[in-house]
From Swiss-Prot:
Keywords: Amino-acid biosynthesis, Cobalt, Diaminopimelate biosynthesis, Hydrolase, Lysine biosynthesis, Metal-binding, Zinc. The gene is dapE. Pathway: Amino-acid biosynthesis; L-lysine biosynthesis via DAP pathway; LL-2,6-diaminopimelate from (S)-tetrahydrodipicolinate (succinylase route): step 3/3. This is Succinyl-diaminopimelate desuccinylase. It is an enzyme of class 3 (hydrolase). Its cofactor is Zn(2+); Co(2+). It comes from Salmonella typhi. The active site is at D68, E133.
């Protein structure tokens, strides 16, 4: 017996949509949505394909996701070619199966079933889909959100299909995410010969006390919803490669994953104060990729929890852990934002896979959420 969720997932996987190339994935979704009465608006920016689709009017529930995937890696290590979906022992293998073409298929099929049962639903059902979430994410959801906000578009609830689950579908729901702030710091010294240190100024030596103090800082202790802010040095570079040259510059890149206890400005001020304290000559470039956001218990969280409890008979954990997602952009619209998707154990890995039965279950959960919020 065929399953529409699995069939659509397989069709999407067959399209090697490496960021930001969509390779026809959105056309598949648009065709299905148009048939059930959705209005489609293409919102492409640069090399990225996006679309905004809606049906009905009033209080709005949007489903958000991305059609792009990360590279497959060494294809010889896959049990089957990564863009040829295969089911083995109930597991559907293929790049994007879990992140997040399975979720996209579940969303579309859930919408089809919902509209068939509720052709005159009271609220508005919408889709916000992009082909660039895995790479730069500069021309994707963020640009669509900016355009929607500019015309005062309404968005009350948003369910992002990111693979939130850890062991069984629905065991973890993400109702927020930490902020992400990166510092690209260059400490300036004077290059010279290692035998004549008095004629040079070693930026590595200069910066060592600063870095030692930086990594020892307790930024906050988190709160009921977020773990404590984390700072990690990601890259550090200096020198010419020669053992007799004192470097002229030291480059250090570090990233903060911060809670709602801090703002990005508070972090910047403290780092700059520390640099001044150690009397360093420096240039700095900050990159804020997302503010922290939190969706407290309310209509969306309650609907999601209800759907999971109804179909999987478990009580999900509400967590804000992990990396960033496009939910950080959508939250700017004032919407309640929650992430619910399949198990994430194999995402971005060789032999990415998802339990086929989980995708069927996910479609039913999505449909029940629609029924609670916009039926």
């Amino acid at each position: 017996m065929s399953c529409p969720v699995i069939e659509l997932t397989q069709q999407l996987i067959r399209r090697p949509s490496l960021s930001p190339d969509d390779v026809g994935c959105q056309a598949l979704m648009i065709e299905r949505l148009r048939k059930i009465g959705f209005t489609i608006e293409h919102m492409d920016f640069g090399d990225t394909q996006n679309f905004w689709a809606w049906r009905g009017r009033g209080e709005t529930l949007a489903f958000a996701g991305h059609t792009d995937v990360v590279p497959a890696g060494d294809v010889d290590r896959w049990i089957n070619p990564p863009f040829e979906p295969t089911i083995r022992d109930g597991m559907l293998f293929g790049r994007g199966a879990a992140d997040m073409k399975g979720s996209l298929a579940a969303m579309v099929v859930a919408a089809e079933r919902f509209v068939a049962q509720h052709p005159h639903h009271r609220g508005r059902l919408a889709f916000l889909i992009t082909s660039d979430e895995e790479a730069s994410a500069k021309n994707g959801t963020v640009k669509v959100v900016e355009a929607l906000m500019a015309r005062n578009e309404r968005l009350d609830y948003c369910l992002v299909g990111e693979p939130s689950s850890t062991e069984i579908v629905g065991d973890v729901v993400k109702n927020g995410r930490r902020g992400s702030l990166t510092c690209n710091l260059t400490i300036h010294g004077v290059q010279g010969h290692v035998a004549y240190p008095h004629l040079a100024d070693n930026p590595v030596h200069r910066a060592a006390p600063f870095l030692n103090e930086l990594v020892a800082i307790e930024w906050d202790r988190g709160n009921d919803f977020f773990p404590a802010t984390s700072m990690q040095i990601a890259n550090i570079q200096a020198g010419t490669g020669s053992n007799n040259v004192i470097p002229g510059e030291l480059f250090v890149q570090f990233n903060f994953r911060f809670s709602t206890e801090l703002t990005d400005e508070m972090i910047k001020e403290r780092v700059h104060a520390l640099l001044e304290k150690h009397q360093l000559r420096y240039t700095v470039d900050w990159w804020l990729s997302g503010q922290p956001f939190l969706t407290a218990r309310g209509k969306l969280v309650d609907a999601v929890v209800n759907a999971i409890e109804h179909y999987n008979e478990i009580k999900p954990q509400l967590l804000t852990t992990g990396g960033t997602s496009d939910g950080r952009f959508i939250a700017r619209m004032g919407a309640q934002v929650v992430e619910l998707g399949p198990v994430n154990a194999t995402i971005h890995k060789i032999n990415e896979c998802v339990n086929a039965a989980d995708l069927q279950l996910l479609a039913r959960m999505y449909q029940r959420i629609m029924e609670q919020l916009v039926a």
